[in-house]
């Protein structure tokens, strides 16, 4: 399982490269350079140097003592990706891809962003490594995440609002790919999740697996054994695959949590694996939210980082073979979990992470006190305070 994808970029039937002919050469170049870089000890050493010296790794493993006592049942631990520089797991991948771009001689970066965290991470590494950075962001997300938009601009990036479609992450990705098709000779496209054509899903996983590798060591040190259950939120799914991957060959239950929005029985959700069907989106065969004519159905979630109508092809594969269970959590459940975590542990998680927390809170009381649940706290909630405030005042659309 740990050797996938195959040479065609497939995870079982999922993945691959469904792109215009003009992108086949740039993708082949990235793939070749990536394999060379991953086999080069000096590249790995430089990557780890920046993670530790610049981003602040290793991130902590926190025993959620108060929540454990309040909920009863299993002991709960948090892998604290919210403690990274820029406030989320996205920086792990951004540093890796920036170093690859530098290795390829590319000094201009294109990125797409939903919640703004990947955009901030891309802008951050562009500043760090002396690169130009263009960030495509849906106009709706620009409004929802105005703080992150200003952070990107402060960091020297150009933020390009996207006005097509639902004006969210899918549309930002469409525009970023369109721009890359026209400028692939001197631009490097820095995808923020385990989505897109091969080799991106594998590349982003390789730059995020540090999460699970650290957590594995930390849990063994804290408990003397691996966790019984690992839970992470899934939009595109990079924090989840980074968390799950080092445990896939172990007897560890893995649960991915999608955004149920206003309920999976409505049309306002982003539960792609739960409700989607096989299809192609952004160059990859995966599960997609689409109608009977194959048209993309606009997703919805209060979380700007989870309202994506596709999912990483490796997640599609893991769901298909039954290795990972995918469930969903509503806006209401996520916000309640965010409040409970803040009040009980003094940690304000991102709304994305709160989806994973909500599922953990449902499961923990049903488990033995000898079991452990490890939750990936993928990001901090500073960016979401206004959204939560609006929601609690009765208008999440503000």
From Swiss-Prot:
Where would you find the membrane-spanning parts of this chain? none
Q: What is this enzyme's catalytic activity, as reactions?
A: (1S,2R)-1-C-(indol-3-yl)glycerol 3-phosphate + L-serine = D-glyceraldehyde 3-phosphate + L-tryptophan + H2O
**Lyase: is it a keyword of this entry?**
yes
Source organism's superkingdom? Bacteria
Top-tier EC class: lyase
Which family is this sequence assigned to?
Answer: Belongs to the TrpB family.
The protein here is known as Tryptophan synthase beta chain
Write down the species: Anoxybacillus flavithermus (strain DSM 21510 / WK1)
């Amino acid at each position: 399982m740990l050797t996938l994808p195959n040479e065609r970029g497939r995870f079982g039937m999922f993945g691959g490269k469904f792109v215009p002919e003009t992108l086949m050469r740039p993708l082949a170049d990235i793939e070749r350079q990536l394999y060379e870089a991953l086999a080069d000890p000096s590249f790995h050493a430089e990557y780890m140097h920046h993670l530790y010296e610049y981003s602040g790794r290793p991130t902590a493993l926190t025993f959620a003592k108060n929540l454990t006592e309040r909920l009863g049942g299993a002991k709960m631990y948090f892998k604290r990706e919210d403690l990274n520089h820029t406030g989320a797991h996205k920086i792990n991948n951004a540093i890796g891809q920036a170093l690859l771009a530098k290795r390829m001689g590319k000094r201009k970066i294109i990125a797409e962003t939903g919640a703004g965290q990947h955009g901030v991470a891309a802008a951050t590494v562009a500043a760090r490594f002396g690169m130009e950075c263009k960030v495509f962001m849906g106009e709706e997300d620009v409004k929802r995440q105005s703080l992150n938009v200003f952070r990107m601009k402060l960091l020297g990036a150009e933020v390009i609002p996207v006005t097509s479609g639902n004006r969210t992450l899918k549309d930002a990705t469409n525009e970023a790919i369109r721009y890359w098709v026209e400028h692939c000779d001197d631009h490097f496209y820095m995808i923020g999740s385990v989505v897109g054509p091969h080799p991106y899903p594998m590349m982003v996983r390789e730059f995020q697996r540090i999460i699970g590798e650290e957590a594995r060591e930390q849990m063994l040190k804290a408990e003397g054994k691996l966790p019984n259950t690992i839970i992470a939120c899934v939009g595109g799914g990079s924090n989840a695959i980074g968390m799950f991957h080092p445990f896939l060959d172990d007897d560890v239950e893995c649960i991915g949590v999608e955004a149920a929005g206003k309920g999976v029985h409505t049309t306002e959700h982003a539960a792609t694996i739960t409700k989607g069907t096989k299809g192609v989106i952004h160059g990859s065969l995966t599960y997609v939210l689409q109608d009977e004519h194959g048209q993309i159905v606009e997703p919805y979630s209060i979380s700007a980082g989870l309202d994506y109508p596709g999912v990483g092809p490796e997640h599609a594969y893991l769901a298909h073979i039954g290795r990972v269970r995918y469930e969903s959590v509503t806006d209401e459940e996520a916000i309640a979990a965010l409040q409970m975590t803040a009040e009980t542990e003094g940690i304000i998680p991102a709304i994305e992470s709160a989806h994973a927390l909500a599922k953990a809170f449902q499961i923990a009381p049903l488990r033995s006190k000898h079991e452990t649940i490890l939750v990936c706290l993928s990001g901090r909630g500073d960016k979401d305070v206004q959204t939560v405030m609006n929601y609690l005042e009765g208008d999440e659309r503000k």
